[in-house]
Amino acid sequence: MMKVLVVVALLVTLISYSSSEGIDDLEADELSSLMANEQTRKECIPKHHECTSNKHGCCRGNFFKYKCQCTTVVTQDGEQTERCFCGTPPHHKAAELVVGFGKKIFG
């Protein structure tokens, strides 16, 4: 009976040690993921800034991520170029207006 208790205690110790190693690995992966997200957040393009070279790099606004909005610009030479900036699309502006109005009414 004593041998069985020793073996069970040994198994419980091994299982708890291996699970704590797994948890440490998960925490390390989660920490590196959070650090990568923070780095991309720092590198995002703010509202009204040019996003011609990185159309998916706009920052988040209050409720939605800004969208890269492009227009065609004709230079004095008659050359057409595309210029883009990060901004809030009209349907997102409308949603933010409704939410802001709702907050004022319902507190």
From Swiss-Prot:
Expressed by the venom gland. One of its GO terms (cellular component) is extracellular region. Residues 21-41 form a propeptide. Its main location: secreted. It holds the Pfam family Toxin_35. One of its GO terms (molecular function) is toxin activity. Keywords: Disulfide bond, Knottin, Secreted, Signal, Toxin. It comes from the Eukaryota. It is found in: Secreted. Residues 1-20 form the signal peptide. Disulfide bonds join C44-C59, C51-C68, C58-C86, C70-C84. Belongs to the neurotoxin 19 (CSTX) family. 04 (U1-Lctx) subfamily. The presence of a 'disulfide through disulfide knot' structurally defines this protein as a knottin. This is U1-lycotoxin-Ls1b. It comes from Lycosa singoriensis.
